[in-house]
Amino acid sequence: MTQFITHKWLAALGLASSIAAFPALAAKDVVVAVGSNFTTLDPYDANDTLSQAVAKSFYQGLFGLDKDMKVKNVLAEGYTVSDDGLTYTITLRQGVKFQDGADFDAAAVKANLDRASNPDNHLKRYNLYKNIAKTEVVDPVTVKITLKQPFSAFINILAHPATAMISPQALEKYGKDIGFHPVGTGPYQLETWNQTDFVKVKKFSGYWQQGLPKLDSITWRPVTDNNTRAAMLQTGEAQFAFPIPYEQAALLAKNKNLELVASPSIMQRYISMNVTQKPFDNPKVREALNYAINRQALVKVAFAGYATPATGVVPPSIAYAQSYQPWPYDPAKARELLKEAGYPDGFSTTLWSSHNHSTAQKVLQFTQQQLAQIGIKARITAMDAGQRAAEVEGKGQKESGVRMFYTGWSASTGEADWALSPLFASQNWPPTQFNTALYSNKQVDSDLAAALKTNDPQEKTRLYKEAQDIIWKESPWIPLVVEKLVSAHSKNLTGFWIMPDTGFSFDDADLK
């Protein structure tokens, strides 16, 4: 609006022709090729990291995580915690506007957290916020959040990409359709969403951080085929691509116009086994399958060396992670265990995948071949985001068709609870959360709950170690690898990188 009026008055003054004489600055438009489709632009209703990463174009939280996964202030300026650990008082940044002109204030925070913590809204990320008892406005720049019980990782929850501040006016206007109409305080605002092709965002002129953003637009384009993603970089159709096909990393590194980056990750890849169903209810079967997979070979075949064999159920860079001796590759031991379990000739099963990109296909095919060597016939199905949401995340134990499920997890809060509880706590079977092994152990449940109630690091260490020791011994998973994150970008693109949880950081991105 302001820009239009300025041009109008300049024309009236007869200066438009002189302005036209100057060469126009080249638009700073960036295309980002990503490996899968988006599910929604409502961060509170997205289970996939990619949708939440793209939503960071429009949205910000009270807190965020830096590239080392440490908590930083964003829309909050600071906070205090009561002695009993139940009340968090947060001071807010002043002078921030939503993209629809509404003020960001304590009432906006309350509107968002009330929505997120209300089970009647059936938001997929409800479990992050279910411990909130109430949110109160103290004054326009102060909000008080009271918890139902102490939860020592709560600030990390507020730093999770899901905890975005959405304009209350937009929430009221669009209701359940807010996922198609994002309105936040972020550096970019929605221009176009072609649900089968791309999301394009444009610079928000009213952004509160002076001098930002530096780009005029970002187009997020899903490209599931690894080779096509790499080709788009080579031809200049894209300026950033992730993930890079591992087998093409060396080739891209030789391109003088591109920069290849291999960065640390908290992305763990694993196969869960539904322990409520035969034959996976038998611990010897689960052990056998762990012996059947040559993880070192998998690293080479599927990840071209850009991964390390898993040494636990929590990636090593997460606090309180425990490391163990990796499972050795021993197919003879695997066959022996199957025989002891009553399956001397093996069995048939299904292996589903939460991804359908080329790397996932390689993992599935490799695993299928490895299992065949010990007599297990696995029928593989690679799912897209919609299938995964319907068949895996949306069904309870009785309806679930999940047997073996290849997927990945990154603890996007940067702490141990989110690396363990959603995946192993008894109350977190689908459709509640992501315990696709349908694993249950009372001691593990007790340890995870107790760890959240204490601020004593030594006690936390003891509790998280005991829980991980039990899980590792009972083997509801086949832990596979921890990925290295390989991205590539045009050398004239700066300030755009991959976070350890596979999200994106692009606040300072610029095209030189």
Swiss-Prot record:
Compartments (UniProt record): Periplasm
Coiled coil: none
Any one Gene Ontology cellular component term annotated for this protein: ATP-binding cassette (ABC) transporter complex
GO molecular function, a single term: peptide transmembrane transporter activity
Signal peptide: 1-26
Protein keywords: Periplasm, Signal, Transport
Gene Ontology biological process terms from the UniProt entry: dipeptide transport
Family: Belongs to the bacterial solute-binding protein 5 family.
Annotated function: Part of the ABC transporter complex GsiABCD involved in glutathione import. Binds glutathione.
Subunit structure: The complex is composed of two ATP-binding proteins (GsiA), two transmembrane proteins (GsiC and GsiD) and a solute-binding protein (GsiB).
Descriptive protein name: Glutathione-binding protein GsiB
GN (gene name): gsiB
